[in-house]
């Protein structure tokens, strides 16, 4: 069997392997076994708005129940909402999210949180995967539901609904914003436009922003099972930017399908990605004495402008591999309370154990409220360097390209040309036979030329 778990759980086209009801059923049994081994009696399930979510939820719940573990269904709720419930519901040994994040509606995925609302480690993920394909006496396949005698049958767990799951999560979010709130609340409430991406935030977001006194307009908040992420959300902010300008709003907020990432729009319609939001929030936390160890965790894909901004602000930073799980791992190791990716995944561990789009939005808004500054003013903290990314198809065997003299020489030439004013990152794709070439520099045309020259060297080497 091929490996099921990718960089963020199991993912694929719904109703095609591995995103089938058969795999979902076996995954439910495997997760139940994992939860039971860690003293859990309950597994939480949440999902986004994709049409296939109901189907996969039913299979997962059946698998979990068949192993004698109770199921609590949270319904449509953001991924970080499942993490929150997994950390707070008594007896919860795991939480399962059915979502494919920012992907089109025809895709879906399954990702797992362990008790405490934490993402699985690589060994824990491997253990669950081994349970899915286990051939032992407790294997997670259909035979476990076919006991030879009634004495050997497992008593099924119950399957029930958490009727107020969204409200519980919304109350948690509002409490995070209101913590230590002082007299700086503006006389006029901020005017906000929120793009729910027709996804998992469409129920929770209206319970949060108006409750906190913001004049809020919601767009793309009418999911139909097929319109999630369609020309909306964190990857398609054009409509949001136009609405912010036309309504005179102070800012716009765009979430992805499962609302674990945030992209912001300032009052002039300019987009702020994760790097710039992280710089704004880190600087404010430092000023308030809340930036533990004076440290922020970023990734190798973070813009060089973020590194330069943090250095200028006197804030230390460590770069990790790509993925919010890598960021969180380094945060735990170093005691950092803030980290994230330019894609909009940001972790504020002072409040939550995972990336959370709505929480990130509230942290950004708190900076605006506390400083009484516009978002465009705050955004001047960081200059985003032009970044060019190109892909080159290569052999699936993934040879060590730095051992090929012509490629190594060209990369070194570009690095020397950029000096400290830019950088080069060449890495293999995690899912496709591609070499990704990323070059950053102060001049866009020169950066394009540098990136193309490296790609040409790779193509000529025929790797």
Swiss-Prot record:
Modified residues (Phosphoserine): 101
A GO biological process held by the record: peptidoglycan biosynthetic process
Binding annotation for Mg(2+): 101, 256, 258, 260
Cofactor note: Binds 1 Mg(2+) ion per subunit.
Catalytic residues as annotated in Swiss-Prot or TrEMBL: 101
The keyword Magnesium is assigned to this record: yes
One cellular component term from this protein's GO annotations in UniProt: cytosol
Top-level taxon: Bacteria
Cofactor: Mg(2+)
Reported modifications of this chain: Activated by phosphorylation.
Family matches, as Pfam families: PGM_PMM_I, PGM_PMM_II, PGM_PMM_III, PGM_PMM_IV
Keywords: Isomerase, Magnesium, Metal-binding, Phosphoprotein
EC number: 5.4.2.10
One GO MF term: phosphoglucosamine mutase activity
Entry annotated with the keyword Metal-binding: yes
Reaction catalysed by this enzyme: alpha-D-glucosamine 1-phosphate = D-glucosamine 6-phosphate
Protein role: Catalyzes the conversion of glucosamine-6-phosphate to glucosamine-1-phosphate.
Similarity field: Belongs to the phosphohexose mutase family.
Name of the featured protein: Phosphoglucosamine mutase
Species name: Desulforapulum autotrophicum (strain ATCC 43914 / DSM 3382 / VKM B-1955 / HRM2) (Desulfobacterium autotrophicum)
Organism placement in taxonomy: Bacteria, Pseudomonadati, Thermodesulfobacteriota, Desulfobacteria, Desulfobacterales
């Amino acid at each position: 069997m091929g490996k099921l778990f990718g960089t963020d759980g199991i993912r694929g086209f719904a109703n095609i392997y591995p995103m089938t009801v058969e795999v979902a059923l076996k995954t439910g049994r495997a997760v139940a076994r994992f939860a039971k081994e860690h003293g859990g009696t309950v597994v939480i399930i949440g999902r986004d708005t994709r049409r296939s979510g109901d189907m996969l939820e039913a299979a997962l719940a059946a698998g979990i129940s068949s192993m004698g573990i109770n199921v609590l269904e949270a319904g449509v709720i953001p991924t970080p909402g499942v993490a929150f419930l997994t950390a707070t519901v008594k007896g919860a040994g795991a939480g399962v999210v059915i979502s494919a994040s920012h992907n089109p509606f025809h895709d879906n995925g399954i990702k797992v949180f362990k008790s405490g609302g934490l993402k699985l480690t690589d060994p824990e993920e491997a253990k669950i995967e081994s349970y899915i394909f286990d051939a032992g006496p407790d294997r997670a396949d259909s035979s476990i539901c076919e006991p030879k005698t009634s004495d050997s049958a497992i008593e099924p767990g119950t399957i029930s609904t958490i009727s107020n799951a969204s409200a519980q999560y919304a109350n948690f979010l509002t409490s995070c914003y209101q913590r230590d709130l002082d007299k700086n609340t503006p006389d006029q409430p901020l005017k906000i436009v929120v793009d729910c991406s027709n996804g998992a935030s469409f129920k929770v977001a209206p319970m949060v922003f108006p409750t906190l006194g913001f004049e809020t307009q919601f767009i793309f908040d009418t999911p139909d099972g097929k319109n999630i992420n369609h020309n909306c959300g964190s990857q398609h902010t054009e409509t949001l930017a136009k609405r912010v300008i036309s309504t005179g709003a102070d800012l716009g907020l765009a979430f992805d399908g499962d609302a674990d990432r945030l992209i912001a729009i300032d009052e002039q319609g300019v987009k702020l990605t994760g790097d710039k939001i992280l710089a704004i929030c880190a600087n404010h936390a430092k000023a308030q004495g809340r930036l533990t160890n004076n440290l922020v965790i970023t990734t190798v894909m973070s813009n060089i402008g973020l590194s330069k901004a943090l250095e200028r602000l006197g804030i230390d930073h460590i770069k990790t591999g790509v993925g919010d799980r890598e960021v969180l791992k380094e945060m735990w190791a170093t005691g950092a309370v803030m980290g994230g990716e330019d894609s909009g995944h940001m972790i504020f561990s002072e409040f939550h154990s995972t990336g959370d789009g709505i929480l990130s939005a509230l942290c950004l808004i708190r900076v605006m409220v506390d400083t009484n500054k516009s978002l465009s003013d705050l955004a001047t903290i960081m200059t985003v360097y032009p970044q060019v990314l190109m892909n080159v198809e290569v052999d699936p065997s993934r040879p060590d390209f730095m051992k090929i003299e012509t490629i190594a020489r060209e990369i070194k030439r570009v690095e020397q040309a950029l000096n400290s004013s830019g950088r080069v990152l060449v890495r293999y794709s995690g899912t496709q036979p591609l070499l990704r070439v990323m070059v950053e520099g102060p001049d866009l045309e020169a950066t394009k030329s540098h990136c193309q020259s490296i790609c040409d060297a790779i193509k000529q080497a025929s790797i």
